[in-house]
A protein has these predicted regions:
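Mature catalytic core of soluble alpha/beta enzymes
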Residues: 1-391
Length: 391
């Protein structure tokens, strides 16, 4: 996409960063295009004299570390650190995948309804954080919604909708109130009704019924980026971008003199087009939407993001982008805000000033989109004027 530059920028445009647009698109095109994904295949490696990229495949998607060209003269050490960061993502997949029978999470799901299961400390911390976000988002983010996801996957294969009875049965298994932590952590995770064995280990997890399962698909990719970022930070790398799939990214420092890393925002109506560009610095970003994953039944479109409170796909939003201090938070909250809508997003962001969001509802007419900006600084945003009207 080429952003319009046929008119000289006004002072207002300049203060909003419009005068930087041509430079941002030129220097950051590849890094931004990485977020557009399959619609722009074949993907171009972002190495056009500006970056070095190292990538791997894990968690059914692509992960990449992107470094500035300042490392091009002697990239060996930075690339070793980048490789170490990507290797960790594979180890985390071996721990968290629910599609592999011997991972720690799969073993937890099989056993936790019958006995306490001790889990690795960092995984336990992630589960505690997931429970906090579940509570803070009023159940709109729920890592126990796997039974609903499995039901809808089955219905899609059978070209039908779930019955009311099927949904009701699955909903009895959904909710983090069914996941029990040790008594000593009651206050930290904010639970009111935890009553496990007082002799349980500090990182024990139990389920209160058969059929409950944890699926970290809506937070695990971001968590993997956060853990990979720890390695880069420990080595004092100050300018890099970590990308997980086409929806999650975390960035540090600046990109070749720009005030951040340019990241492309996909148009949810026309996935092959870029809706705009956001400059990301020392933050994480995640986007949730149903532009790619959906199915149709009897003429109606059903997206893949399920409201765990009702069991039905959410229809109120086209896409939601969240900026947060960590990629795990951004991942989880983009899903929660997609489900909970503008009111939840505004309420959450007002209570968590380090979190901001862009929500894109369906257009009232035509294909002109009107994003709802909750706290994202305007100087970070560069919209495609063809798709987003100027205020």
């Amino acid at each position: 996409m080429s952003l319009p530059s046929d008119q000289p920028p006004s002072r207002r445009d300049f203060l909003a960063g419009r005068a930087l647009r041509d430079e941002i698109v030129t220097v950051g095109q590849a890094a931004g295009d990485a977020m557009l994904g399959e619609a722009n295949e074949p993907r171009r490696e972002p190495t056009s004299g500006a970056t070095i990229r190292l990538a791997t495949s894990a968690m059914a998607t692509d992960f990449a570390v992107i470094l500035n060209e300042a490392h091009r003269d002697d990239p060996r050490q930075p690339l070793r650190w980048a490789s170490e960061a990507l290797d960790l993502i594979h180890l985390l997949e071996d721990q968290m995948s629910v599609y592999r029978p011997n991972t720690e999470l799969s073993q937890l799901n099989r056993a936790a309804a019958s006995r306490p299961v001790q889990v690795e400390e960092r995984l336990f911390e992630l589960l505690c954080r997931a429970r906090e976000i579940w509570r803070e988002t009023e159940g709109c983010f729920d890592p126990t919604s796997g039974p609903l996801i499995a039901l809808w996957r089955q219905c899609r294969k059978e070209v039908r909708l779930p019955t009311d009875l099927e949904l009701a049965e699955r909903l009895t298994l959904v909710g983090m109130q069914h996941v029990m932590f040790p008594r000593s952590l009651t206050l930290r995770v904010g639970s009111e009704k935890l009553s496990p064995d007082s002799e349980s280990q500090a990182t024990d997890v139990t389920f209160d019924r058969d059929g409950v399962e944890l699926n970290l698909g809506s937070i695990g990719k971001g968590y993997a980026l956060d853990r990979a970022a720890e390695i880069l930070n420990e080595q004092n790398l100050t300018e890099w971008l970590l990308q997980g799939g086409h929806s999650s990214v975390i960035a540090r420092g600046s990109h070749n003199g720009l005030p951040g890393w340019p990241v492309g925002l996909r148009n949810p109506l026309l996935p092959q087009r870029r809706l705009g560009t956001i400059l990301l610095r020392d933050q994480a970003l995640a986007t949730s939407g149903t532009a790619v994953q959906h199915f149709r039944f009897e003429g109606k479109r059903y997206g893949h993001i399920i409201d765990p409170r009702t069991g039905w796909p959410t229809e109120n939003m086209l896409s939601v982008t969240v900026l947060a201090p960590t990629a795990a938070e951004a991942d989880a909250l983009s899903t929660a805000f997609f489900v909970g809508g503008v009111e939840l997003a505004e309420r959450y962001c007002s209570n968590h000033r380090s979190v901001s969001a862009l929500l894109i509802p369906p257009p009232t007419g035509g294909q002109r989109l009107e994003p709802i900006n909750i706290g994202v600084p305007e100087e970070m945003l560069f919209w495609n004027d063809e798709d987003v009207p100027r205020p």
